[in-house]
Amino acid sequence: ARLGLFPLQWTAALQDKLDTRLADVSLSVPEERHAEAPIWFSGAAAKNIHLLLDDTGLQALFSNLLKCAIDRDRQGKVHPAFIKIIEALSPDDARFLSLHSAIEPLKEELTSQVRNPMRELIRRRIPELDELPQAAIDASIDNLRGLSVVHSSVSNIVGLDRGSVTRVELKLNQFGRNFCEVCLPDSTDDDL
């Protein structure tokens, strides 16, 4: 009998967790600034409400997006694609994006020959990612590029007085900066 009731108990526990998180979102926006979320946002948010139950780091991004969507003063910053971006991120992608945005843009001029200039740039500028396998970092960069959040460039400059130089850069584009401003943890709490 207990096993038969498990699905109902589990569903009730999820509902309680969801209710708590939605209440937290609502309470974080001053009452005088509360607004109904745009209709184009509400449907997509409802389809992806599972992101609010995620405990891998994506929950904070979705929660901040919801805060902006119901905040009259910040609604204009919300873009329909932000939900899809969060849905397409791995926890490693979210962590990489958070660390990258804090020291944006990443730029280096490498005078020594390195096999993978982008990897060297990340190794030098974001040492917090050293514990991640290089394949995970490469996948995160590729995914963020594919989502049109970051732009990267690698160019070789020959003939300078110090020999050949490889200029490598990874930066958020304007869309990526907007996404970070709206969705990254603590970015929406500063002006509440």
Where are these regions (language model features)?
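Charged, alpha-helical interface segments at or near domain boundaries
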Residues: 1-89
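Short amphipathic alpha-helical interaction segments
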Residues: 36-42, 127-158, 165-167
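Amphipathic, non-membrane alpha-helical segments in soluble helical-bundle scaffolds
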Residues: 55, 94, 134-137
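Generic structural signal for hydrophobic core residues of well-folded globular domains
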Residues: 65-69, 86-89, 100-104, 144, ...
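Short amphipathic alpha-helical interface segments
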Residues: 79-129
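Short, amphipathic alpha-helical interaction segments positioned at domain boundaries
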Residues: 161-192
